[in-house]
UniProtKB/Swiss-Prot annotation:
Residues 5-294 form the RHD domain. It is found in: Nucleus. SMART domains: IPT (SM00429). The lineage of its organism: Eukaryota, Metazoa, Chordata, Craniata, Vertebrata. PROSITE patterns: REL_1, REL_2. The keyword RNA-binding does not apply. It comes from Meleagris gallopavo. This is Proto-oncogene c-Rel. The gene is REL.
Length: 538
C-alpha cells in the first residue's frame, strides 16, 4: 500500500536565547531562530510533508511543555498570525516550509483566563484536552512553550478538512526568566588555580536562580562542583565560589572544563577552560631559575678563592665622651725596661735585686705594633726600688756620668732627649720582688725622700727638671694598663714638676758642693743598701 502522509520537522527552533516580549513593550517580538542559525547564516524553524504532493494548509500554535499538551495562553505574533496562532496555505512547489516571522508574545497573569477562553472559542486544541482541564490556570508554565505544527489536506471538495497528526517541537524557553534562561558564563576573574582547590573565583553570568544553579568542573568521567551558598549568588548575575580539588596530584598544568548547570532541567552553559596547577609554592618556576647548582657554586668559590667567604672586619669605633668630642688616645709611655736618667739602663731586675736573679721571670707580651716607652722624666720620678739612694749605691760614679746627654745649645728650644729602651717588668708572680714594696703594699713605687733627691748631682737635676717641664702635661694624660702604676704620689716632687719654677730649683742646689763629695756622702750614709743579705732575708 501507499504510505500515509505525515509531518516531519526539518529544523527545530532554538530552545534558548529568545526573550518573550509583552504586548505593552510596543515592539516586535522578533523571530524564532532555528537551532542551526548563526549570525552569518540565519535559519528558522522548518517542516516538510512527506508522502504527499499538493496544496496544504499549515497551522502553528503554542502548547504547554508537558503532557497533556494544552493550548498555551501566550500568543504567536508576526506575519499570517491572528488570535494568537499562525495559519497559511502552501502550494505543491514548496517541499520545505519555513516560518521566518514567528514571534512569541507573553500575556500577563491577569489575562490568562481571557486568553484560554479565546483558544477554546477558536477551537485551538490540537490534542483535544478536556475543557475543564484548560481552565486550571495554576498548571501553566509561563516561561516555556512548544510549537505545535498541524497540516490540513484538501478533500474532494477542496476544503482543508483532512488533518494530519499534530507534531510538537522542542521546548522554547524565555530567556528573560531566571529559571529557564540560557546559561552563559560572561567572565571570570581567574582561569587557573591550585590542584588542591580552594581558590576563590568571581564569575559573572546571565540571570540565574540562586537555588537552582551549580558550577561544574568536568574532565572525561571526572566531575566536581564548586563550593558556594545561596548568599554567594549576587543579584542573579554573579557567583562567588571556591574551586574543588582535582582528581589526583599533578606535575604539570592540566586543563578541564568549567560550566554552569541548572539541576531542575539539567541545562548547562557553554564550557570555559580552567587550568589546574601543580602543588608548588613557585608554580611558574621562578625559584628554580634563581637557584644555582652545586657545581656552579663550587666553581665560583674556586675562581674567587677564599676571599668569597671572608668578610672584612669592621673598623673600631672611636671613643666618644658624653659631650660628643673624640678622646685622643695617648701612647703608653712606660718602657718595658727600667731606665733612669743619668743612671744608665738596667737590663733586668737582677741588676737591681741580686736576690731575685735566681727566680724565673716572664717578660710581658706586647702587641706587634705597640712599643710602650717611658719618658725619661717619668722614669726618673718613678722607680720600683725602695729608695733612690739604694740604687745609687749599686753603681759607680762613672756609670752615672757616662750616659748623661749633653744639654742643647744655649737658646735652643729643644730639650734634652733620652733614648728609651724596653722595660722588662718583673713577673706578676715574683713574690720576692713585691716583698720589697712593704710600704706601698705592692701597689706602687716607694717614695724618695727629699734628702735623697738633693744628693743627686746638679747636672742630673738640671737635666731631670728640663725633662719634667717638657712633659708635665703628657704625664697627667698618660694611659697605662699596668696595675703597678695606678698609685703615684707626687707630693714630694711638686717643686720638681712645676715647669715655671724649674730655674729656681737650680739655685737651691749649693754650687760649691763638689759633685764627687755629694755622691760619696750619699753612698757612705747607707752602707747596707746593696748588701745581698738584705734581699736574701726575704
Amino acid at each position: 500500500g501507499i504510505s500515509e502522509p505525515y509531518i516531519e520537522i526539518f529544523e527545530q527552533p532554538r530552545q534558548r536565547g529568545m526573550r518573550f516580549r509583552y504586548k505593552c513593550e510596543g515592539r516586535s517580538a522578533g523571530s524564532i531562530p532555528g537551532e542551526h542559525s548563526t549570525d552569518n547564516n540565519k535559519t528558522f524553524p522548518s517542516i516538510q510533508i512527506l508522502n504527499y504532493f499538493g496544496k496544504v494548509k499549515i497551522r502553528t500554535t503554542l502548547v504547554t511543555k508537558n503532557e497533556p499538551y494544552k493550548p498555551h495562553p501566550h500568543d504567536l505574533v508576526g506575519k499570517d498570525c491572528r488570535d494568537g496562532y499562525y495559519e497559511a496555505e502552501f502550494g505543491p512547489e514548496r517541499r520545505v516550509l519555513s516560518f521566518q516571522n514567528l514571534g512569541i508574545q507573553c500575556v500577563k497573569k491577569k489575562d490568562l483566563k481571557e486568553s484560554i477562553s479565546l483558544r477554546i472559542s477558536k477551537k485551538i486544541n490540537p490534542f483535544n484536552v478536556p475543557e475543564e482541564q484548560l481552565h486550571n490556570i495554576d498548571e501553566y508554565d509561563l516561561n516555556v512553550v512548544r510549537l505545535c505544527f498541524q497540516a490540513f489536506l484538501p478533500d474532494e471538495h477542496g476544503n482543508y478538512t483532512l488533518a494530519l497528526p499534530p507534531l510538537i517541537s522542542n521546548p522554547i524557553y524565555d530567556n528573560g526568566a531566571p529559571n529557564t534562561a540560557e546559561l552563559r558564563i560572561c567572565r571570570v576573574n581567574k582561569n587557573c588555580g591550585s590542584v588542591k582547590g580552594g581558590d576563590e573565583i568571581f564569575l559573572l553570568c546571565d540571570k540565574v536562580q540562586k537555588d537552582d544553579i551549580e558550577v561544574r568542573f568536568v574532565l572525561g568521567n571526572w566531575e566536581a562542583k564548586g563550593s558556594f551558598s545561596q548568599a554567594d549568588v549576587h543579584r542573579q548575575v554573579a557567583i562567588v565560589f571556591r574551586t574543588p580539588p582535582f582528581l589526583r596530584d599533578i606535575t604539570e598544568p592540566i586543563t578541564v572544563k568549567m560550566q554552569l548547570r541548572r539541576p531542575s532541567d539539567q541545562e548547562v552553559s557553554e564550557p570555559v577552560d580552567f587550568r589546574y596547577l601543580p602543588d608548588e609554592e613557585d608554580s611558574y618556576g621562578n625559584k628554580a631559575k634563581r637557584q644555582r647548582s652545586t657545581l656552579a657554586w663550587q666553581k665560583l668559590i674556586q675562581d674567587c678563592g677564599s676571599a668569597v667567604t671572608e668578610r672584612p672586619k669592621a673598623a673600631p669605633i672611636p671613643t666618644v665622651n658624653p659631650e660628643g668630642k673624640l678622646i685622643k688616645k695617648e701612647p703608653n709611655m712606660f718602657s718595658p725596661t727600667l731606665m733612669l736618667p743619668g743612671l744608665g739602663t738596667l737590663a733586668s731586675s737582677s741588676q737591681m735585686y741580686p736576690a731575685c736573679s735566681q727566680m724565673p721571670t716572664q717578660p710581658a707580651q706586647l702587641g706587634p705594633g705597640k712599643q710602650d716607652t717611658l719618658h725619661s722624666c717619668w722614669q726618673q720620678l718613678y722607680s720600683p726600688s725602695p729608695s733612690a739612694s739604694s740604687l745609687l749605691s749599686m753603681h759607680s760614679h762613672n756609670s752615672f756620668t757616662a750616659e748623661v746627654p749633653q744639654p742643647g745649645a744655649q737658646g735652643s728650644s729643644s730639650l734634652p732627649a733620652y733614648h728609651d729602651n724596653p722595660l722588662n717588668w718583673p713577673d706578676e708572680k715574683d713574690s720576692s720582688f713585691y716583698r720589697n714594696f712593704g710600704n706601698t703594699h705592692g701597689m706602687g713605687a716607694a717614695l724618695v725622700s727629699a734628702a735623697d733627691m738633693q744628693s743627686v748631682s746638679s747636672s742630673s737635676i738640671v737635666q731631670g727638671t728640663h725633662q719634667a717641664s717638657a712633659t708635665a702635661a703628657s704625664i697627667m694624660n698618660m694611659e697605662t694598663n699596668d696595675m703597678n702604676c695606678t698609685s703615684l704620689n707626687f707630693e714630694k716632687y711638686t717643686q720638681m714638676l712645676n715647669v715655671s719654677n724649674h730655674r729656681q730649683q737650680l739655685h737651691q742646689v749649693p754650687a760649691t758642693c763638689p759633685p764627687g763629695s755629694a755622691w760619696q756622702h750619699s753612698l757612705s750614709s747607707q752602707p747596707n743598701v746593696a748588701d745581698r743579705a738584705v734581699y736574701s732575708s726575704f
